[in-house]
Each structure stands twice: as C-alpha cells, then as structure tokens.
A protein has these predicted regions:
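ABC-type nucleotide-binding domain
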Residues: 1-228
Length: 228
C-alpha cells in the first residue's frame, strides 16, 4: 500500500533499490497503469475521470532513454506543441542549452536526424527532449533518471536545461545521483513496492535506513562531502 501527497510546485525525489517500485509509482501517477485499489488524483480529481488527452496535457516527461523521430530537429522539438513558431522553437532550444550545437549542424534546425537520434550524443538527445518538454510547458514534469548516463562534459549543460524546464513546475524525479535529490522538497524512498521512508534530506539522514545507506555509500565511493 502507498499513500503519497505531492503539493503543487514542489519537487519530489523518488529513490530506492533497483526493482523497488520507483518507475511503477511514476507509471501510476501518469496513468500509464491503473491502480488495482485506491485512487490516484490530480487536483482532487481521479485520473480515471480525465480524458487521456486532458490528462496527458498536464505532464511532460524526460526519460533516461530518449526517443527522437526520423525528422528534422525542429519538428522533434515542436512535438511538444505542434503550432509553435520557429522563434519559439529556438527559444526553447536556448533554454535547454541545445541551440549552440544545433546551429553548428549542416542544416541547423532543418537537419534530419536518424530514427532514435543516432547522429547525436546521449547528452544532445536528452537536451532536445528537454527542449520538447519546455515547449509543451505542462505543469507537472516527470524526470526518469534524466542525467544517469551523461558524460561529465555534458552534465552541466544538461542540469542547466533541467533547471530551465522545472521552474515553477511540480517535479517528480527518479534519480540515483545524490546531488540531484538532496535539495528536493520531499524525498520518497521506495522498496519492495512500498514507501519505507519519506522526508527531507536532513530528516532522512538522521534515520538509520535505506536513504542514509544510499548517501553513505556514494560518499565513500567518490570521496566527497556534502556542502553544508
């Protein structure tokens, strides 16, 4: 059983062991799956009472595995809002820190990319997906390990892009990276399909549990100390 409230315009980080239920929880929130019992509500309304188009208009998604269409970069970004002008596409790309590398491509925004975006690096593909989400401008953003496989050179630009996307939004974030979760308004620890801990970073560090072990293991692995 899970009971969770996510206030509007806050950041909720979901952490836990692999297979513990993090992705399942996000799938239920967005109604990719339906609950067997109980209910999931959005703004006090059961998600089953929304039309699928109406429900999806409330969400933007940035997944670890990015899918791009075999089309121009501009059309890939405009997928977030089909009626967007070229100027609006460029503005979204600038916010997502991908305008510079797009401008260097042979045909700029008219460059056709292969199915899956094979001609782009992982960080570039993720920034285009973030530009798409910025274009959509949905009130709720679900980030599924969006920075997990990014090389150090691209990480800062990607994090800047995520910051641009998440301003004034309700954020639900699955992540393994400590620095992306420690400033969340609430951290939810999921294990074996249950919420086993919930609170802020400071609160959870005072408890003996999965979260403290998660933090201690990462500090030991990379020999860093959290900024006080």
């Amino acid at each position: 059983d899970i009971s969770l409230s996510i206030p509007q315009k806050t950041t909720t980080a979901i952490v836990g062991p692999s297979g513990g239920g993090k992705s399942t929880l996000c799938n239920l929130i967005a109604r990719f799956w339906d609950v067997d019992s109980g209910e999931v509500t959005l703004g006090g309304v059961n998600v089953k009472d929304y039309s699928m188009n109406s429900l999806m208009s409330n969400f933007s998604f940035v997944f670890q595995s990015v899918y791009l269409f075999a089309d121009t970069i501009e059309n890939n970004i405009k997928f977030g809002r089909q009626d967007a002008s070229h100027e609006e596409v460029v503005e979204a790309a600038k916010k997502a820190c991908c305008h510079d590398f797009i401008s260097k491509l042979p045909d700029g925004y008219d460059t056709v990319i292969g199915e899956g975006g094979a001609t782009l690096s992982g960080g570039e593909k993720q920034r285009i997906s973030i530009a798409r989400a910025i274009m959509k401008d949905a009130p709720i953003v679900i980030l599924d390990e969006a920075t997990a496989n990014v090389d150090p050179e691209n990480e800062k630009e990607l994090m800047d892009a995520v910051d641009a996307l998440t301003k004034e939004k309700t954020i639900i974030m699955i992540a393994h990276r400590l620095k992306t979760v420690r400033h969340a308004d609430q951290i939810v620890v999921v294990d074996k399909g249950r919420i086993v801990q919930q609170g802020t970073h400071e609160q959870l560090m005072k408890q003996e549990g999965i979260y403290k072990r998660f933090v201690d293991a990462r500090q030991q692995a990379v020999s860093w100390k959290l900024a006080r």
